[in-house]
Amino acid sequence: MQQIMLMCRPGFETEAGQELMDSAAACGLFGYFQPIRNAGLVRFTLGGPESAFELMQRIPLDELVFVRDWFLVIGDCPLPARDRVGAVIEFLRGADWQGSLASRLETRLTETNEDRDLGNFARKWVAPLSRGLREADMLAQDSASAKGDRLELLLLDFETAVVGLSLADNRSPFPQGIPRLRLPASAPSRSALKLEEAWKVFIPEDRYLDYLGGGRKAVDLGAAPGGWTWQLVQQGMMVTAVDNGPMNPELMATGHVEHVRADGYAWRPKRAVDWMVCDIVDKPRKTARLALDWVGGKLCRYTVFNLKLPMKKRYEEWLICRDILLQGLAEAELNCRLRARHLYHDREEITCFIERLD
């Protein structure tokens, strides 16, 4: 297998392809990418003797920012109007597919798919296709024998399926990298979902209490009307909301929030807190330096902040901000972990997470 299918936010295909091309080159692997414009899909093809599997063994998905999820591409399978199950079986036989490689399959759609009939077909097709593949020894009979690797079928339309394999230890825990979240009626704004998604992406599920529990203290810079503050309060935190704008009255009535009318970039706490979060729309380098000031000054242990990218050279701007952050953390001689991801609930921004490990 020489090709990988990348999934990203529609409109950011070039950034995702460039990012993987640079990451591969850093490992001594070279290839090229073909974006499927405004579909949130990119085909990345290795140009040398190395396999796509080798590339995925060297590059953890967690280290990528614009790539939400990916899988190894076996090939494009034409789907006839009749007996599509048989067509997939014959395609896999022709590709020398080993049934022990995967124990289950998933059907995928492009994020921009608006064909309800295709969506209904994708859901209903899983059971008969799985049954047919197992009967043909194209799927392992039990999950233990396949180590959790999964056969993927990305339906571009009713005529074509991109068939591939996702690796259990290097794929998103969420379908196509998108957590399915619902906005409670009590949340002041939809931005609440962004912070929730950030926690799900950056924090191991079995360590939620370690990071978020125990009555922690937090600061929300640029808080109004209170979407991120609301999420912090839901975790039982005492929150200082810093913003010159008005906060949601119901949120203030919880007794967990102190509203400070001040400039989020200038204000600093008298004592260190556990969390600092910031969703201020401003120049990304300014926000990156703000986060460095908080972490470097040991004003917080954890921070989640957004970097608003420009309309042009978005990937290049992220690289500049990344270097600012990494260099600043190194100069502060702090043991920290930096992660970033273009979340589903992000638009023209990316979300960063820094935690102090000392």
From Swiss-Prot:
Signal peptide: none annotated. Transmembrane segments: none annotated. Keywords: Cytoplasm, Methyltransferase, rRNA processing, S-adenosyl-L-methionine, Transferase. Monomer. One of its GO terms (cellular component) is cytoplasm. It is found in: Cytoplasm. This is Ribosomal RNA large subunit methyltransferase M. It comes from Marinobacter nauticus (strain ATCC 700491 / DSM 11845 / VT8). Its main location: cytoplasm. One of its GO terms (molecular function) is S-adenosylmethionine-dependent methyltransferase activity. GO terms for biological process: methylation; rRNA processing. Belongs to the class I-like SAM-binding methyltransferase superfamily. RNA methyltransferase RlmE family. RlmM subfamily. The lineage of its organism: Bacteria, Pseudomonadati, Pseudomonadota, Gammaproteobacteria, Pseudomonadales. It catalyses: cytidine(2498) in 23S rRNA + S-adenosyl-L-methionine = 2'-O-methylcytidine(2498) in 23S rRNA + S-adenosyl-L-homocysteine + H(+). The active site is at 308 (proton acceptor). The keyword Protein biosynthesis does not apply.
